[in-house]
Every structure is written in structure tokens, then in C-alpha cells.
Design a protein with these regions (language model features):
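Short, positively charged, Gly/Tyr-enriched micro-motifs
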Residues: 2-105, 109-116, 165
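Residues immediately flanking
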Residues: 32, 109, 135, 174, ...
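Short small-residue beta-strand/loop micro-motif enriched in glycine and branched aliphatics
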Residues: 38-40, 138-142, 316-317
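RNase H-like nuclease fold core
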Residues: 84-169, 176-181, 188
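Acidic/histidine-rich catalytic cores and adjacent linkers
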Residues: 126, 162-187, 196-199, 219-375
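Short alpha-helix plus adjacent loop in nuclease-associated cores
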Residues: 198-219
Length: 375
């Protein structure tokens, strides 16, 4: 024995009393490392040797329902130590995690960092995380760093060729990198563009046309500001969702501006297109929207509709009638998680927390492999 030192290790409370395990820990010569090392004690936490492993598992369980800060206050443990312990347990759970077999997945990015945290060798794409969700269970099955093509490539490489063959449908937004990754690894899968993002891009084109009309005919000096930016949401809202005042507003503008009348009919027609029961019916309605845009000389809408004409990603929606709405719900949960912790600096830890809160990396699911392994 080279030396020994006194250790006071925190343990789980007993009858609301703090429990501390006190013992001597020896230091001996290690033939493998060729230096003096402290003896290995398997019931101590490797990242925080002043805590027992049982206490670490308990901290991880508590962090499933509240923030690390609140857990540290509840257990009277340093916040940084609580964070390190929680990350260690999550990484240990990740070692035994197996991505489940999936056939329908939703892929979406979530904003993880602000531009202030962007490093010199990074681009804006690196500020995001790519979140993959199973449509059947509505659970997050994987989280990758950035929103590049390589982020989704990592997931497909992990599940292997056999797993890629099982995937039938992938829903995502119009991000080019995701589409290229799906085409490379899952050529037999149908890529479906999300309806929400399609409507969002349509609204942007529609708003640009409103701006043109405002620049051409708007006259705030005479009180004629019905086309002003403060009323832009009236022009983007469906007719059935407008208030009585909004309906009067749009009727007043349509009586004076023929192009706005065209745009109103185009907007309502475009929204109705998603209710079509067949691809041919939807194509006919999109062609009508395109023709009306040409007649109205709405160049932004013409360009937008033309870009959709031959895209199978759009027409696959009418084949499967599926969207990435589940990912939007998950994104709301992720934003709540981020808000609860006042943000994350460690993106690896953030990804693990997403899989803990919204996926299978928690005590309810992920511990089964550990118990089975030890019995």
C-alpha cells in the first residue's frame, strides 16, 4: 500500500436524516497504468467520488421531473456536482440504449443555441439539433448535433441498412439536407413535406404581394392604411377564422383592389387543397392557384406554386395523409425543458435531456436492460 485517505461519501437519506459513509480509501501501485492509483470502489460515483452510486441514480430520477437546480436545492448538493452526476448516469443509460425498429419517422430541427454561442469554425446550422421522432409512439428516438445532412446520416448509419429498409415514410420540412440524406440511405421511403411548413412559406409569399400593393397604393396621409403591415395577419388568416371586423376590413380592401381579391381566392383555394382525397384532385387545385396567380400578376405566388408542381414530396402528403405535427409538439416540450433550465451550454447534455424527457432514456424504459444484465 502506498497511502490511504479518509473519504466521506454522501448516501441516500434515511428517515429524513443525512447519511454519510466514512472509510479509508487505499492508494496502490497499478501494474497496468504503471503508477499509483486509488483503489476502484464500484459503489462510488466515478465523476463525483464523494457520492454513492445509489445517490447518483436517485438524483437522475429526480431530474426527470424537475431541473438540476431544483434537485441540487432539494438534496443540498452543489449544482455543478448534480449536473455532472446526472450527465454521467444518462451517458451510462445511453450505452445500453437500442434505437427501436421504426417504419414512420418525423425529422425536425430545434433551435438550441443563440448566435452568441456560435464558435469561429461553426455556421448557423450548428446552432440547431436534429430530433427524430417515431410517428407510432410519439417518442424521440434520437437527437443529433446540427441540422446538416450529416446529422441525419448519423442516425441512418446507426440503424444500419436493414433498419433503413424498414422505413416507409419520413416527414420533414423543406430543408435540403434532410431530403438528400433520405434519398441516399432510404431510397425506398416516401419523403413527405410537412403541411405546416408549406403553408408557412405560402404565407411569406402572400405577404410579399401585400407589401407590393401597400408600396403602390398605400396612402397613410389620407388615412388609407388598410394594407399596412399592422393588418398583415388579416390577409393570412382563413376566412372562417376572421372576426366580424376583420371580414369588413378584407371586404373593404377587395372592393378597391382587384389583386387583393385574387389573392384572397387563391389563399382559400390553397388551404382547401389539403382536404383533397386524391393526388389528381390536389394537382388540379394547385394548377388553378398557379393560373390565378399569373392572371393577378403576383410574381411571388407564381414562383412558389411553380416550385411545387413536380415535387413528389408534396404529392406524397395526399398518399399518406401524415404530417410532422408530432415533431412540433415535441419542439414545444423541448422549449419548455430549455426554459426550465434557463438554457444549456453543454449541447451533448441537452441532447441527453431531450431523450430523457421526450424519449426512452429514463427510469421507466431504459433501466430494464441494466436490471436484465445484472440478474
Amino acid at each position: 500500500m502506498h497511502d490511504r485517505y479518509w473519504v466521506r461519501a454522501r448516501h441516500l437519506k434515511a428517515f429524513n436524516w443525512n447519511v454519510v459513509v466514512c472509510f479509508y480509501r487505499e492508494k496502490r501501485w497499478c501494474e497496468s497504468c504503471k503508477k499509483v492509483r486509488s483503489e476502484w470502489i464500484d459503489w462510488l460515483c466515478p465523476t463525483s467520488p464523494h457520492m454513492t452510486l445509489e445517490l447518483c441514480w436517485w438524483i437522475n430520477r429526480l431530474s426527470e421531473i424537475t431541473s438540476v437546480l431544483q434537485v441540487s436545492k432539494l438534496e443540498s448538493i452543489d449544482k455543478m456536482a448534480t449536473y455532472k452526476v446526472d450527465k454521467h448516469i444518462l451517458q451510462r443509460l445511453l450505452q445500453g440504449y437500442k434505437i427501436p425498429n421504426v417504419t414512420h419517422i418525423s425529422v425536425d430541427e430545434v433551435y438550441a443555441r443563440s448566435p452568441v454561442q456560435q464558435k469561429e469554425n461553426e455556421t448557423r446550422d450548428d446552432l440547431f439539433l436534429t430530433v427524430i421522432v417515431d410517428h407510432r409512439t410519439h417518442k424521440v428516438i434520437w437527437v443529433s448535433q446540427s441540422r446538416r445532412k450529416e446529422a441525419l446520416d448519423t442516425f441512418f448509419e446507426m440503424i444500419g441498412p436493414e433498419g433503413c429498409k424498414q422505413i416507409k415514410v419520413v416527414t420533414c420540412d423543406q430543408h435540403r439536407g434532410y431530403g438528400e440524406s433520405v434519398a441516399q440511405y432510404c431510397p425506398g421511403a416516401d419523403l413527405v413535406w410537412d403541411r405546416f411548413h408549406l403553408v408557412q412559406n405560402f404565407n411569406e409569399a402572400l405577404n410579399e404581394e401585400r407589401k407590393k400593393e401597400w408600396d403602390k397604393y398605400g396612402n397613410p396621409a389620407d388615412g388609407d392604411d388598410l394594407l399596412a403591415a399592422k393588418y398583415r395577419y388579416i390577409y393570412l388568416t382563413k376566412s372562417k377564422n376572421r372576426s366580424a371586423l376583420d371580414k369588413w376590413h378584407i371586404k373593404e380592401v377587395m372592393s378597391k383592389n382587384e389583386k387583393i381579391s385574387y389573392m384572397e381566392f387563391i389563399k382559400e383555394h390553397f388551404h382547401k387543397m389539403f382536404d383533397c382525397t386524391s393526388e389528381n384532385e390536389a394537382k388540379e387545385m394547385l394548377n388553378e392557384c398557379y393560373e390565378w396567380s399569373v392572371q393577378a400578376k403576383a410574381s411571388n405566388l407564381v414562383k412558389y406554386f411553380w416550385s411545387l408542381m413536380e415535387r413528389n414530396e408534396l404529392w406524397n402528403y395526399f398518399k399518406h395523409k401524415i404530417t410532422s405535427g408530432v415533431s412540433e409538439g415535441i419542439n414545444r416540450a423541448i422549449k419548455t425543458l430549455k426554459w426550465q433550465a434557463y438554457g444549456y451550454k453543454d449541447m451533448v447534455y441537452f441532447a441527453l435531456k431531450i431523450m430523457q424527457k421526450c424519449g426512452y432514456l429514463n427510469s421507466r424504459y431504459a433501466l430494464s436492460w441494466l436490471y436484465n444484465e445484472n440478474t
